């Protein structure tokens, strides 16, 4: 027998931190987060299989997340700064998919580009267990928080909790949402803080009314430049934004070699991070009076991806002057609902939503996302947060040198080149 639920909160955060429960990464602190008497860990009670060792390709995961990223980019305002993590949003929706069935599950998987669910889950599981270097890494952690007074589906452990732990390395906690809500909030915030190295110390002030479950995903990226900038070569200069000219701190490198491309309309550069195949790719208009928004936005998803990929086979040339702004950008995407529904995720919002692997009578009410990036002389840190609220329903080489002066709007991605997967994507129109 399943008890009808009033709300289900699923929250995914990508945030700056060094600890995670699913990755073997420098700075990681695997294991259970310390909790008090209001919370009981059920993690060890759930048996999962070992990670598959024969996975050498992440093609489905890469293709799905990258296509999802391009769809997101096209749906966001063209006149503003944007920054988001398709990896975060797709991971959150994949967690949601674990509990979905029927048409709801089909729509989620179509939007994510899942063609073989077992393969997708195996690739996700293997990616979460990927080894990273000391200086450049991605951490991922997941947890499930369940109200102890709620009656769940009789098969929730087999159908939902075990796959969540198996594929997403999720810790599972039972908590007293009703009797000790303040302590539960404190424990949840402590978990997030611990698993983000205190970069996100709080996500809850109170448990939203009627909430019976919280799924929390934390992902953190940190990368130190392979060729770092130095503070003595950082000085103020103009950035010519779409709406105004501003004076910002500009970092400089001189006479260094980078991978560089120019197709006559758009030029790009690859800035590698130390130790792993993670890079930042930056794209600008070739012409001084060019508009990156116009040039990039007119491309199809396939053409955008080809542009990004073209840097992988481009020439390594000497860049006489590389000028990159030192910046912090934090963006919110409130109400992804319309975007996601336009991507085909519709029944999840309706009375006919099918999340029966968790409980009957629940549906998504809203999806929100915010992300933050810090770029300085040492490297990059990136953070993001996604929350899904679910409520009750009634149901070539050259001797020439080049300059790359980033003093006007640009598009950039942070990409794991070992898989080709876009972890973060953004555009800066103004600073």
PLM ranges: what are they?
Residues 4-177, 428:
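Detector for small/aliphatic-rich hydrophobic stretches
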Residues 8, 12, 33-46, 361, ...:
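Non-catalytic interaction/Regulatory regions outside core domains
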Residues 33-38, 79-80, 117, 121-286, ...:
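Non-catalytic, conformational "gating/processing" segments within enzyme and secreted inhibitor domains
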Residues 86-90, 209-213, 419:
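Short alpha-helical patches at coil-to-helix transitions and adjacent helical residues
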Residues 102-108, 289-292, 331-333, 383, ...:
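Extracytoplasmic/secreted cell-surface and envelope-processing proteins
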Residues 215, 267-283, 397-431:
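Extended hydrophobic
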